[in-house]
Amino acid sequence: MELGRATKSWSIHTRSEIIGKYKVMERIGSGAYADVYRGRRLSDDLTVALKEIHDYQSAFREIEALQMLQGSPNVVVLHEYFWRDDEDAVLVLEYLTTDLATVISNAAKEGIPIPVGELKRWMIQILCGLDACHRNMIVHRDLKPSNLLISDCGVLKLADFGQVNLIALIIFILFGFST
């Protein structure tokens, strides 16, 4: 199984539509359904995260949710995506340098508490991101510190929407109308 996964992960480096627009750099994360690479957009040198999703349902849910949440200041930005039926989806996402799990771990190791004002600001940003989700009838279902990314200027954003429930889609399928 690992051999197959390694082969799939390598496909991001060989797909012409991706390498024609992006330089794929080091892998920065890996999970059950996806691998994430740091990348650089060739047209303007923008650093991005390239998320290769190996599971069809996770890819569908994440793309749908991020498209619905475009413009929300506390949700990671989806720049574009590449997806064909016979290959893994690759999402081009906003690159954020750290996550809340890393910040908490570093603070604990260094014995330096995170300032209360910073914690309050992040809590408000988490709630704003969740509010955007809930207004769009999206339930995240995988909120944890490692899925809360933080920019260099301290803005916290919700990420990893592969396990979401799209309530509006469920209502449409069950009842044939939208809310």
What are these regions (language model features)?
Residues M1-S16:
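Juxta-kinase regulatory segment immediately upstream of eukaryotic protein kinase catalytic domains
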Residues D35:
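Conserved N-lobe ATP-binding subsite of Hanks-type protein kinase domains
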Residues E52-P73, H79:
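The N-lobe alphaC helix and its flanking beta3-alphaC-beta4 segment of protein kinase-like domains
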Residues V77-A89, T97:
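Short beta-strand micro-motifs within the conserved protein kinase catalytic domain, predominantly
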Residues L96-N106:
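Structural motif in protein kinase domains
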Residues W122-M123:
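Activation segment signature within eukaryotic-like protein kinase domains
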Residues H134-I150:
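Catalytic-loop of the protein kinase fold
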